[in-house]
Amino acid sequence: MNRIHAVILDWAGTTVDFGSFAPTQIFVEAFRQAFDVEITLAEARVPMGLGKWQHIEALGKLPAVDARWQAKFGRAMSAADIDAIYAAFMPLQIAKVVDFSSPIAGVIDTIATLRAEGIKIGSCSGYPRAVMERLVPAAAGHGYCPDHWVATDDLAAGGRPGPWMALQNVIALGIDAVAHCVKVDDAAPGISEGLNAGMWTVGLAVSGNEFGATWDAYQTMSKEDVAVRREHAASKLYAAGAHYVVDSLADLPGVIAHINARLAQGERP
């Protein structure tokens, strides 16, 4: 059948952890713990979607963070420094990720709708396996259990923005064509991952990292503030090449219906 056979879903900010707060807060704590260097939550969000070692490396290259680092140590951040921050990050993230394992509103119903249509549920994450081994069973306890998952350090080729985690899902799920897959993510590296894998891509503008609000804050936010944040997030996701941008995973079934119509007309990603 010339239709969508699988979706490949990100985790934090896409299916669990509205606003993607688990990783961002831990980066701030890890920099402070390892080197007594302060970074802001906004800075911690900038490279979101990359593997966590690569995320720390990218943070060290942000001009403001690099300036603070140079002022304190008289040199740029080194690979050994990144290793030290990562060593601080990992136990903090492993300990706290279960506190951010609840599915985002609409996720459970959306997964049920997709499965009723015969669509398989793949997933991948910028989290390493040690973190995913805590997160996956915790999310399952809340009712979210994808058919497959891949961690950022599982594959020798690497993680995002490369296509490998998405393609590993294709193999594991037995999907016959990447054009029959949709990659869904709330951050630009995950959109690039899907494009590099030859898939349709859907960005999430409200539930994730770029919007950057807790569920409670979002619920009490003015329509004007929501619109401004949504536009900011959507512009970044479209700039990354997303075929579609919607608010959250709850909007995905409608997008898939649209993609199926395009596939039936012979279109490809």
Curated annotation (Swiss-Prot):
Enzyme Commission number, as recorded: 3.11.1.1
A GO cellular component entry from the record: cytosol
List residues binding Mg(2+): D10, A12, D186
- Please list the GO biological process terms of this entry: DNA repair; organic phosphonate catabolic process
- Tell me which domain of life the UniProt entry assigns to the organism this sequence originates from: Bacteria
Oligomeric state and interaction partners are given as:
Homodimer.
Q: Spell out the protein name for this chain.
A: Phosphonoacetaldehyde hydrolase
Report the source organism: Salmonella paratyphi A (strain AKU_12601)
